[in-house]
Amino acid sequence: MVIGAGNAPHAGEVFLQLGETGGCTSGGEEEHINNRSWISFNTSSNMFELVDDTKATWPVNWVKWYGAYAFAQYYTASLPTEAQWECAAQGGQQLEYPTNDGTLDLTKANYNGDTPGVYNPNGHSVAVGSYPANPYGLYDMGGNVWEWCQDYYGESFYIDGAIDPVNTSAGPNNKRVRRGGSWNYHSATLLTYWRASDFENRGNNHFGFRIVKQAE
């Protein structure tokens, strides 16, 4: 685990949950080795290090919302708002799925088929660019790993029709938005308008993020 320190945003919070090799799923199956954390934290240098050089182009996983937020701030960027994420996912064409043509099959994204609630013990994330980009040139907006958004989650917030909305109200559950589905989730969760949420301090093998930065 890595703890935010100093004057960093959310100092004292756990940013990253480092997954171990050889774990088991809640159903008792052995977890795929590629679902371990492929980065480690060197306490001597105070820096992250790659455990496996072959994973350099894979999406980071096990990241909690705090860690994703802090990373974005460190690079003077931000997490996408939910509205920004959906706009990017649709590729300027109101796509149903955030693929190259708005349709979905297993040649276009890394996900777990069409049946809800089925865990894939052989599943794992894959390298970015393994599937075609969407019309904006963005890879893996659907599947691979869920992506944290900046907003707090509100069940009815996003249907009010506001332009470029950002939900800054924590609400009763204090959850943040995540979008895009993952290798471990079924096809419906990859829809460009499918919404999900989770607690800020939760990370696992299918939670990741991407950042946005204003063009200079």
Labelled PLM ranges:
Residues V2-L18:
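N-terminal low-complexity segments that are often proline-rich with Ser/Thr-Pro
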Residues I3, F15, D164-N167, K213:
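N-terminal non-cleavable signal-anchor helices
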Residues I3-G4, Q90, Q150, K213:
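Residues at helix-coil transition
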Residues E13-V14, G22-S26:
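Aromatic- and Gly/Pro-rich amphipathic surface segment
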Residues C24, G28, I33-N35, I39-A196, ...:
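Functional-site microenvironments in short loops/helix caps that host divalent-cation chemistry
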Residues N205-E216:
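Short, structured beta-strand segments at or near domain termini in extracellular proteins/domains
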